[in-house]
Amino acid sequence: MFNKILKFTQKKTGYLYNNSLFLQNIDKLIFASIMLVFLTSTVMSSDVIGFIALITVFLTIVKVLTKPNETLSCKSFELWLLAYFMLVIVSLAGSTLFHLSLKGFFKTFTYMAFYFSLVQYLKNNRNKIPYLLGAIGLCVSFEAITGFLQNFSHVEEISGWQDVSGLNPEEVMTRVYGTLKPYNPNLLGGYFVAGIPSLYGLAAYFLADKKYKFAIGGVLLALFSTLTLFLTGCRGSYIGMMVVFCGMFAVSAKYLWQNYKAIYLSIVGGVVAFATTAILLVSSLRARVLSIFAMRQDSSNSFRFNVYHSSVDMFKDNWLLGIGVGNQNFREIYGLYMKTGFDALSAYNIFLEIAVESGLFALIAFVGFLITLIKNSVKFILKSADTKSVIFAATALISICAVCIHGLVDTVFFRPQIQFVFWTMVAIARTIVVE
C-alpha cells in the first residue's frame, strides 16, 4: 500500500524531479547531513545533533516522495523494531506524565527516523559504507587524542566519578572525558565501545584491498583509541572492549585458523598477556578493574544495586505499558521508589529501562529485534565468501553487541552520540546482511 502511494506521488512529481537541481543532488545532501551528524556529535549539544539528524530525515522523506523507483521494504528483524516503536507510542499515550514522556518520545522518534534515512540511503549507496565508518573513526580518533592529552594535564573531576575511599594516591585514576557533552568519562567510554570497531574494521578493509599504509594507520589509530578507552576509567567500557576483542578474534578465525593457526594463537595470546600485564603493573587500572568485583564495597556498585532494586519495583507496578519514555519522566516517577540519597536519571541497564519505560512487551520486541539481527548477521559472516562484506557485517555486529553488553551496567546507551552510531551500525548490518 505504501509503495503504491509512493509510486503515485513520484509520478505526479516526476517533472519537478527531472528539472530540479536540488532533487537531482538530494543524495549528496543526505550524505553530507549524515556526516555532519557524526562530526557535530563530538562538540555540540544533544539538541543541535538532533536537529541535524532531523534535516537528514526531512531530506530522505522528500527523496522517497519524489525520486522514481524509490520503495519501502520491511525485513524480518524490522518487524520486531516496528512492534517496539508502536508499543512506545502506546506507552506514551498511557503515561501519567504525558508532557515529559512526549519529550522522550521525540528523541526515540528521531533515532528511529535517522535509522530509516540511513537504510534508504544505503540501498543504492553501499559504496559509501567505508566513508560512514571513516567519519565515525575520525571522530573516535579525535576524542582519543583529546582524552590522551587530558590524562597528562590531570583534569579534575567535574563530579564524583570515582570512589576514592580506601585507595592510595597512586591508585586514583585521572578519568578523561573528551569533548562529548555532557562531560562524563562513562559517556566517552561508551562512545569508544561503539566507535572503535569502525577503526579496526577499516583497517581490515584496507588490508583486504591491499592498501597497506592505510591499514597500518587504521590499526595504530584503533590501538591508540583503545588505550584512551582505558584512561576513561569506565568499567562498563572495559567489559564492552573485551566483547570487541572477542568478536574480532572470532571473525578473524574464519580466515586465519586453517592456514595461519600459529600466528593467530600468538596474536590472541599476546593481547591477553599484554592486558593482564597492564592490569597487574598499573596500580590505578588494577584498582578500577578490581572494583568491578567489590560488589557493595564500592559506592558506585552499591548505587547501581539500589537503582536496580527500585527500578524493578517500578516495573512490577507498571509492567504492561510502562511509565512512558524519557529520562525526565523516569526521574519524576523514580522519586516515588528511590532509596533516600540515590537519585537517578535512568535504570543503569538498557533492558531494564525499556521494560520500565515501555512495558514487558516492548522489551520482548526489542530483544527479538536484537536476536534476529544478530542471528542473521552471524549466518552471513559464516557463509559469505565476500571478504569485504564480511568485514562490514562483522564491524557492525561487534559494535552492536559491545554496546548492548556495556548497556547492561550503564545508562549512556540513550545518549545521542552513541545512539546515532548504534543505529548506523544496525543500518550497515541490514544493508550488507539482508539486502
Tell what function each PLM region has:
Residues 1-103, 120-134, 203-216, 259-266, ...:
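Transmembrane signal-anchor hairpin modules in multi-pass inner-membrane enzymes, especially those
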Residues 34-35, 167-182, 305-306, 339-353:
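Juxtamembrane membrane-water interface segments that cap and precede transmembrane helices
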Residues 43-52, 103-104, 179-195, 236-237, ...:
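Membrane-interface micro-motifs in multi-pass membrane enzymes
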Residues 170-178, 262, 278-309, 333:
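Flexible juxtamembrane loops connecting transmembrane helices in multi-pass membrane enzymes
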Residues 250-253, 358-402:
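Hydrophobic transmembrane alpha-helices and their immediate junctions
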Residues 295-309, 313, 317, 321-358:
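Long extracytoplasmic/lumenal interhelical loops at the membrane interface
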